[in-house]
Structures are given as structure tokens and as C-alpha cells.
Amino acid sequence: MRAVQRGRIEGIAPIAAGSAADREAAMRAAGARAIYLGEPGYPECLPAIADPPDVLFVRGSVPAVPMVAVVGTRRSTAYGRGIARAFGRAVAEAGWALCSGLARGIDGEAHRGSLEAGGPTVGVLGCGSDVAYPREHASLIAEVERAGAVVTEYPPGTPPHGWRFPPRNRIISGLSRAVVVVEAAATGGALVTAARAAEQGREVFAVPGDVDRESSLGCNLLIRDGAIPVLGAADLIEALTLVIGPPVTPATGDHPSIPAAGIAVEVLAERLGLTGQAFLAWLGRSEVLGSVRVEGDRVYPGGR
């Protein structure tokens, strides 16, 4: 664990001279707090990666539920942005937290989709937590903080130099149970995130696209190399449910008594208090576990 020594955090280049007290004042001014590796509050899944950050500067609260990363190119198409937003909504409705990089294009739309559905979301920055980058996302960054957390390994005031972003991508994948790439060129940050996810043992998903479109080439290459293709929001939730399972909450953890004659799907959803993707996630997981069986529009007890 790195210690605060001689007015700086050991191992992180200082952005300005100052004492430890100055750093604490800067964090307070930024509304951030420092969470060190091994201390309470440090995200549980990060220590398992090869190179976890020794300190995280956090604004907001990191959600306790499993996270799913949805990432992609800044140079996105309207089609890709629509998919990213739909995926963000679906992830939130299923009960997971959305993680992304708060960048232009795919990242921003994924965050917006999660926020629209009232879900928790986490944005990982490649700069200080008090630096709005890109500037036009200042209000989005504030919304993400209110709904979840803004996280970075860089101290307040750190500028968004390009070389800082590839290292931050390991945090996006490290925080998440799975990584979904919506649109990506053959090179770029989204493919870095996918590569780090694979190294960390996370499942990688990708949206197939036009073979002649540059913004789809990265996704098509990922699928060629073994990533799981996803064809829409419902397909994504079904695949994620098989990989990580829905989070256990009072609603999704309950298995109501299902009569031998079965029960209509819509009636079961109402009894569970679940709607949309959240219900589909519960139903898919329950089928996998063998606790229910679906035939047409009715659900029966498992094992029959």
C-alpha cells in the first residue's frame, strides 16, 4: 500500500508542490475521498486483478451490486449510440450497475441509459475527479456522482493527458463482471478495455456490425477472436444472466409458490414486483437453476 509521504502520494507523480494537508484540502474541495487498497470501502473485485490501483479517489458511493461495463468509440454512429443507451437502460432494469468511462460517444450514452432507468452507474476518469473531461459532460459527471460514483486513480487537479487513459481502462474492466463493446475501430481504448477484461478473466461481449464500417471493425475482430456476440438488449441480459446471474435482492431472491397447472407470465411478474429486463433476468436465471420451466406464456414449477 502506498503511503502519503513528503506531501505526495508515493508512486504518483505530483501535479503541484504541496503538503499532505494541501492534498487533503484539494480532495475536500473536489468532494472526493481517498480509498486505499486493503482498506474498507475499496471495491471488492479490484484486488484480484494483476495491477490494482493502490489508491482510488472517489466522489459518490460505489454500488455494492455487480457491475457491467458498456464501452465503445468516441467516434460513434447514431446506431451505436442508440444501442449503448438501450444497453444502459437494460443493465439498470436488470438490477446491475453500469460502468463506463464518461467519454463522448458510446460511453456517455451508456451512462445516460442507466440514469434514465434509475440505475446506479460508475464513471472511471483518466484525470482528476475535479476535472470535467470532456467539458460538455460536466453535467453528466455530476449526475453519475449522484446516482453512483465517479472514480479515478489520479489525484485532484490531474489533467486529462492521452497517456493516462489506457491505464484507467483496466479499472473499468476490473470493476466489472463483464465488458460489452458496442462500437469500436480496430485500435483504441475500447479494445484496450476488452483486452484487459480477458486478462482479468472477465467475459467479453461485442455487437456485430457492418464489415465495411470502420467503427464496427473492432467489434467484428473481437467476435472473430472469441467474444460473445450480442444482438440486442434482451439478448445481452439473457447472456449476462448466464454468466453472472442477477443480483440477489428481496424481489429477485423470492421464488413464489407456482401451482402445478402453471401461472401466466404477466401474473408472475406482477407477484414478483418486477418489470421489463429485470423480470426477464429473474426468469432466465430461474430456468438455468431448474426452479421454473417456461412453456409458451406460462411458467411451471421446475423439475416437471
Which stretches of residues belong to each language-model region?
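Glycine-biased, small-residue-rich flexible motifs in mid-sequence functional cores and linkers
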Residues: 28, 34-304
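Accessory alpha-helical DNA-binding modules that contact the DNA backbone or grooves
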Residues: 1-44, 289
